[in-house]
Amino acid sequence: MATTTCQVVGLLLSLLGLAGCIAATGMDMWSTQDLYDNPVTAVFQYEGLWRSCVQQSSGFTECRPYFTILGLPAMLQAVRALMIVGIVLGVIGILVSIFALKCIRIGSMDDSAKAKMTLTSGILFIISGICAIIGVSVFANMLVTNFWMSTANMYSGMGGMGGMVQTVQTRYTFGAALFVGWVAGGLTLIGGVMMCIACRGLTPDDSNFKAVSYHASGQNVAYRPGGFKASTGFGSNTRNKKIYDGGARTEDDEQSHPTKYDYV
């Protein structure tokens, strides 16, 4: 029951994280215009992985897709690739994990095969979550670098009053898509870890010792009392031996060395 619960929870978390990764990849607000100390408030700009948008104060929004691939920054293309790879791996992991559920029986599939499928889906989810987190973090680092470079250019020394002249430049800060991507990547990563933990519950324990068959009556050993009879030298020893209940073993089987009751 614990294994099935762990599988289901891991699958649901990974499914939710995958949906968040898809939503974050398609969102336009990866970077939004920083309105702090900005005299121009009639126009609000924001950019995504696939297009840039301009929203006017009247509510009209115009988006323009990126019509080039080679002309885009290399970091932006890397973020695109990471997010797409994470989504593809997440979809494959979802399909594998559905068939790996312990509560679903498909033909003669045993638990060892389900354990391998569960481990595979868990690894796929972990890689998918890592790709999403790395992609979002790379884009965030690019935003931070550009932000401080723009800030330095705004207050560059160009003479004038106090030797400082402030120029108006558009600075971008974190958008909502970054936070969605971070949360989605974390959920996918946690779901993958739970699937890997559930794999241990499906793996047969090979460290157990092999079972040894024995007679149940051997636990309570009782003796049959009997006297001793003198034997002749021509026949076998006719004395009564202590016999164990539940088996054909006699006292000679248990003790082979001579005793004081042996006669010639």
From Swiss-Prot:
Effect of deleting the gene: Parenchymal expansion phenotype and overall lung enlargement evident from 18 days post-conception (dpc), as a result of increased lung cellularity, airspace enlargement and increase in the number of AT2 cells in the lung alveolar compartments. Increase in AT2 cells in S and G2/M phase of the cell cycle with no change in low levels of apoptosis in the lungs. Increase in bronchoalveolar lavage fluid leakage as a result of alveolar epithelial cell injury at P3 and four weeks of age, resulting in an increase in AT2 cells in the lungs by four weeks of age.
Supply the induction statement.
Induced by 17-beta-estradiol in bone marrow stromal cells, osteoblasts and osteoclasts.
How this chain sits in the membrane, per its record, is: Multi-pass membrane protein
Extracellular-side positions = 28-80, 144-176
Ranges where the record places region Disordered: 241-264
The entry's note on the tissues where this protein occurs is: Expressed in the lung (at protein level).
Q: Tell me which Pfam families the record gives.
A: PMP22_Claudin
Residue ranges for the region (Required for role in regulation of RANKL-induced osteoclast differentiation) are 198-264
Where exactly are the transmembrane stretches of this chain? 7-27, 81-101, 123-143, 177-197
GO CC term, one of those recorded: plasma membrane
Keywords on record: Cell junction, Cell membrane, Membrane, Phosphoprotein, Tight junction, Transmembrane, Transmembrane helix
Q: Which family does it belong to?
A: Belongs to the claudin family.
Q: How does it assemble?
A: Interacts with TJP2/ZO-2. Interacts with TJP1/ZO-1. Interacts with YAP1 (phosphorylated); the interaction sequesters YAP1 away from the nucleus and thereby restricts transcription of YAP1 target genes.
What name does UniProt use for this protein? Claudin-18
| Species this protein is from | Mus musculus
Organism ancestry: Eukaryota, Metazoa, Chordata, Craniata, Vertebrata
